[in-house]
């Protein structure tokens, strides 16, 4: 495609110079640029394609950064980045080394007001900005998807909007989707809030008629979209009851109408709910047909046929930890006919779709409501029913009090399947799963473990149902290096606090958590080149530790290395040092993990080099810390 307009847009001021008639052409160029770039890098595709016209219209009518846009989640901000001076090589490398973040990032641009990555906070942040702002001429525009209204935080903020708040426009991008289809009464109810029961029944009849049209009529989705807009325009929305002046619904893919509507409401003296209807994936036929698969794509998605996926993970070897976890839960579902699985909007990412299809009555997606997911799971456990709450590490932060008050304090046997435990690499600072141990370890009654491979993962899941205590099974989103057994229960259960010695040596004790055992075994080989032999231990459990085994090993090991892909504060290293202190054991301990900093996005090798967790870095840090006298590897010495 030839780009005639986009290369000349270096700021919103350049956009303002265009005539209204040129905006549809610019939108086409932006949409093509996103598809072109993400075909090389991967990233969040469907949500950005659906928001092109809306974002262009917002920047055309308002003047960022004086007028402030706050994107909820922020993964749909690619168009915003292109319009605010970031249509550079960095955009072409988005989410990779030397590329832009996939979320709004103030370090990139003063047009990004907040770091983003988690859902539901935009309205609260925007209200705070409005409260503290000394610039009475500035507009504040939180931009939310309809799924954000399943977040309690959004509803709390909605309950606190002053009726006399001016130049405050809530932009509701209603595409009836989250990552997957919306769940729960509120997002689905947005449409029902908009119009009364008679219109709702009419809508259902019309949509049913549209779906029964011949399959060769490819415009069915477009027709449904227009019907929604027409019917919603007949209604009186519930948002008026919150003191908001409702405007909409507006066709989110008609940039001229969007501009005209925004210009009309720009200086209204009360807070406004601006309701826009969009189609997720708009402009790319396959993304429109399947917005769930195209929510997030891998690089070269246009050049290879997309295989059947669970989330963004292609079902091909080697199988990842989340895929193994999903398969294991299906087998557990067959073995334990009461087992319930709960997730907060992560059914696809955490590979739970097979469980949902096999056991629909025993699967609950609560939407973007992590606190409810945890407390709901506690209620299930209290009834005597086994339950697994599957949740990303980074999103578990949002439910810390629920874990404390509703699970651990009640001593309820909820199994937490903590996905994405470790570095998130391309998704960056908001998504790294490297902080959860800091609060989980402080929770009484909590058992915490992490497998090094699929076989241990399998044993932990099967064993956890026998522990009868709250437990957390952590695992990263990386390939697991061994296949699970695929049988029901071929092993004796693991008891909490059972560690495993992987190899024995005389000079060092290296304790490595989870998948870092692979790195530890490589480091062990490197150290052999220096004549240093190492005992490598997989603790399996962070809490409780295998005290008996550790006390035995520490009788003849005084030099200890702790290796984990977690913050050095509050993780395995902290638990081990506490263990030494409690037992009055003296040892020289080198604790290696993620340093006390926010880790940026980037390729795995780059990030691991940055934080010193490659096998070469670790080897050199061990040699330096313990001041081993051999200056060069023995192997190289004899070769010389």
UniProtKB/Swiss-Prot annotation:
Role played: Catalyzes the acyloin condensation reaction between C atoms 2 and 3 of pyruvate and glyceraldehyde 3-phosphate to yield 1-deoxy-D-xylulose-5-phosphate (DXP).
Pfam family, one: DXP_synthase_N
Classification via Gene3D superfamilies: 3.40.50.920, 3.40.50.970
SMART domains noted in UniProt: Transket_pyr
Sorted UniProt keywords: Isoprene biosynthesis, Magnesium, Metal-binding, Thiamine biosynthesis, Thiamine pyrophosphate, Transferase
Stated family: Belongs to the transketolase family. DXPS subfamily.
Subunit architecture: Homodimer.
Associated pathway: Metabolic intermediate biosynthesis; 1-deoxy-D-xylulose 5-phosphate biosynthesis; 1-deoxy-D-xylulose 5-phosphate from D-glyceraldehyde 3-phosphate and pyruvate: step 1/1
Source species of the chain: Chlamydia trachomatis serovar D (strain ATCC VR-885 / DSM 19411 / UW-3/Cx)
GO MF assignments: 1-deoxy-D-xylulose-5-phosphate synthase activity; magnesium ion binding; thiamine pyrophosphate binding
Name of the protein in question: 1-deoxy-D-xylulose-5-phosphate synthase
Alphabetical list of HAMAP family matching this protein: DXP_synth
Note on cofactor: Binds 1 Mg(2+) ion per subunit.
EC number: 2.2.1.7
Leading EC class: transferase
Taxonomic lineage of the native organism: Bacteria, Pseudomonadati, Chlamydiota, Chlamydiia, Chlamydiales
Gene: dxs
Cofactor: Mg(2+); thiamine diphosphate
Entry's Gene Ontology cellular component terms: cytosol
């Amino acid at each position: 495609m030839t780009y005639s307009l986009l290369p000349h847009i270096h700021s919103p001021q350049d956009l303002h110079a265009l005539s209204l008639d040129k905006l549809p052409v610019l939108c086409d160029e932006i949409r093509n640029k996103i598809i072109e770039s993400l075909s090389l890098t991967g990233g969040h595709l469907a949500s950005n394609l659906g928001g092109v016209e809306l974002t262009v219209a917002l920047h055309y009518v308002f003047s960022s950064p004086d007028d402030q846009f706050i994107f909820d989640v922020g993964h749909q901000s690619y168009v915003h980045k292109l319009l605010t001076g970031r249509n550079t090589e960095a955009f072409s490398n988005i989410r990779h080394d030397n590329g832009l973040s996939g979320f709004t990032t103030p370090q990139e641009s003063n047009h990004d007001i907040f770091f983003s990555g988690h859902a539901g906070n935009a309205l609260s942040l925007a209200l705070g900005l409005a409260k503290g702002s000394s610039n009475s001429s500035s507009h504040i525009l939180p931009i939310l998807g309809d799924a954000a209204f399943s977040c309690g935080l959004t509803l709390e903020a909605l309950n606190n909007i002053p009726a006399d708040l001016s130049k405050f426009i809530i932009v509701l991008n209603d595409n009836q989707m989250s990552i997957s289809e919306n769940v729960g009464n509120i997002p689905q109810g947005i449409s029902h809030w908009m119009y009364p029961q008679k219109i709702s029944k009419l809508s259902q009849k019309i949509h049913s008629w549209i779906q029964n049209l011949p399959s060769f009529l490819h415009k069915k989705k477009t027709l449904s979209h227009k019907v929604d807009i027409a019917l919603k325009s007949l209604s009186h929305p519930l948002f008026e009851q919150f003191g908001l002046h409702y405007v909409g619904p507006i066709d989110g893919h008609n940039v001229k109408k969007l501009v005209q509507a925004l210009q009309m409401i720009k200086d209204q003296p009360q807070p406004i709910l601006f309701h826009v209807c969009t189609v997720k994936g708009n402009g790319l036929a396959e993304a429109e047909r399947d917005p769930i698969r195209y929510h997030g794509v891998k690089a070269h998605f246009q050049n290879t046929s997309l295989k059947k996926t669970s989330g963004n993970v292609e079902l091909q070897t080697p199988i990842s930890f989340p895929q193994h976890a999903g398969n294991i839960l299906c087998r557990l579902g067959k073995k334990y006919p009461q087992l319930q699985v709960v997730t907060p909007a992560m059914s696809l990412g955490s590979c739970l779709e097979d469980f949902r299809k096999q056991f629909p009555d025993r699967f609950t997606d609560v939407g973007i409501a992590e606190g409810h997911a945890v407390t709901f799971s506690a209620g299930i456990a209290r009834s005597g029913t086994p339950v697994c709450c599957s949740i990303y590490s980074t999103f578990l932060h949002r439910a810390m009090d629920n874990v404390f008050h509703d699970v651990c304090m009640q001593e309820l046997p909820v199994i937490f399947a903590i996905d994405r435990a470790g570095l998130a690499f391309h998704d960056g600072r908001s998504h790294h799963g490297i902080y959860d141990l800091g609060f989980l370890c402080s929770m009484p009654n909590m058992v915490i473990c992490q497998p090094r491979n699929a076989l241990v993962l399998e044993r932990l899941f099967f064993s956890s149902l026998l522990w009868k205590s709250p437990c957390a099974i952590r695992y990263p989103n990386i390939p697991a290096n061994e296949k699970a057994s695929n049988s029901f229960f071929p092993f004796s259960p693991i008891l909490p606090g059972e560690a495993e010695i992987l190899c024995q040596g005389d000079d060092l004790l290296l304790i490595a958590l989870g998948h870092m055992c692979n790195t530890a075994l490589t480091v062990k080989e490197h150290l052999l080149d220096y004549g240093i032999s190492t005992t490598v231990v997989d603790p399996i459990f962070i809490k409780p530790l295998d005290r008996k085994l550790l006390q035995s090993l520490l009788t003849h090991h005084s030099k200890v290395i702790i290796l984990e892909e977690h913050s050095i504060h509050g993780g395995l290293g902290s638990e081990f040092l506490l263990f030494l202190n409690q037992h009055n054991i003296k040892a020289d301990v080198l604790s290696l993990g993620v340093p006390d900093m926010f880790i940026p996005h980037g390729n795995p090798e780059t990030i691991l080099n940055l934080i010193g967790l490659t096998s070469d870095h670790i080897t050199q840090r061990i040699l330096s810390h313990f001041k081993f006298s051999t200056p060069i590897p023995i192997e190289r010495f004899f070769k010389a």
